[in-house]
């Protein structure tokens, strides 16, 4: 399995269990998810040697809660955050500087294409700004990547957008 992490914070953003496609401009990964519902916090009696009594048929799931949402968000503990258009512009300026600095260290040949492509990508994001929900990594570090959540034309299928140059991949 390959885990994709934020280069700035090293927060886990997504993995290769999802359908991943590179955007036509080569700047981002689109990661397709699903809406899921899962019970968290339940303890399986079989794991602790318990045996449910036939006399007591109550539905006690041990303080468990039901969580529903996009699987990418839930599985990788992404945290929702909010932006106005102006606050996103300020954030993205700082984020681009951080990614550029990382690229200068790790992949200098990628700096020029990144700086050219990111301008058009940001214009595209700002043009569709009202469609997006914004997510940071688990630590909610304000310097880290903010992933974008949108839905396909069917209005049902969620997908997330991650800046390709802001990610490192780690094989597990």
From Swiss-Prot:
InterPro entries named among the record's database cross-references: Mss4-like_sf (IPR011057), Mss4/transl-control_tumour (IPR011323), TCTP (IPR034737), Translation_control_tumour_CS (IPR018103), Translational_control_tumour_p (IPR018105)
PROSITE patterns linked: TCTP_1 (PS01002), TCTP_2 (PS01003), TCTP_3 (PS51797)
Subcellular location: Cytoplasm
Domain TCTP: 1-172
One cellular component (GO) term of this entry: cytoplasm
Keywords in alphabetical order: Calcium, Cytoplasm
UniProt function note: Involved in calcium binding and microtubule stabilization.
Family: Belongs to the TCTP family.
Name of the protein in question: Translationally-controlled tumor protein homolog
Gene behind the chain: tpt1
């Amino acid at each position: 399995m390959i885990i994709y992490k934020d280069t700035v914070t090293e927060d886990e953003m997504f993995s290769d269990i999802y359908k991943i496609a590179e955007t036509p401009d080569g700047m981002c990964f689109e990661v397709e998810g699903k809406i899921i519902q899962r019970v968290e916090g339940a303890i399986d009696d079989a794991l602790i040697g318990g045996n449910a009594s036939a006399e007591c048929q109550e539905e006690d799931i041990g303080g468990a809660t039901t969580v529903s949402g996009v699987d990418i968000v839930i599985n990788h503990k992404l945290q929702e955050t909010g932006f106005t258009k102006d606050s996103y512009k300020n954030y993205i300026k700082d984020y681009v500087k951080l990614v550029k600095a990382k690229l200068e260290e790790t992949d200098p040949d990628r700096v020029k294409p990144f700086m050219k492509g990111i301008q058009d990508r940001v214009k595209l994001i700002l043009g569709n700004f009202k469609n997006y929900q914004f997510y940071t990594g688990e630590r909610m570090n304000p310097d880290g990547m903010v992933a974008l959540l949108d839905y396909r034309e069917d209005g049902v299928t969620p997908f997330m957008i991650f800046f390709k140059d802001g990610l490192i991949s780690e094989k597990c």
